[in-house]
Amino acid sequence: MAAKVRSVYEIFTIKSNDGARTIDLRGGIVSFSYFENVFSPMITAQVLITSTGNVITDEDGDLVSIYNGLPLRGGEKVSIKIPSNSENNVDLEFTEEKGNEFYVASITNVLIEAEKEIFTLNLVSREAITNETSRVGKKFPSSEPISDSVKEIIEKYLLSQKNVDVDETQNPY
């Protein structure tokens, strides 16, 4: 069931890769979509941003666009906090303080003109990046239940700080 009241973005910021700049994106959000699936190992989101351009001061003191001013290239941290807007919804909070912020996986649909810019940020959880950059170089014992191997991979290789609930299995490999 859809909410009857619009969402309010308490926090929607992006931090440059060098950590020097943080930009509040709340005024430029056209749409925000959040995806969570029991069959997916990660949380993803998409946000469509529009800006009138020239909102960041660069090193020379000139005003430049968000895309060129941060610059947006991927890997930037995005913090989001959206309180629930109905009794059926839950708060969404992905912030550095909680250690579960999103990361920019890619920037698509980029349109930059003289006085405006539009782009889509494709966001992923930290586990998505770790999943792509980590290797498990171990053979797991065939005598142990699969659930034990899953727990070990998540905790020791993916280094997830999240509370992971793995159903116990009886079957070994």
Task: For every predicted segment, state its role.
Residues 1-135:
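Assembly/oligomerization scaffold segments
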Residues 113-173:
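Charged- and aromatic-enriched interaction segments used to assemble
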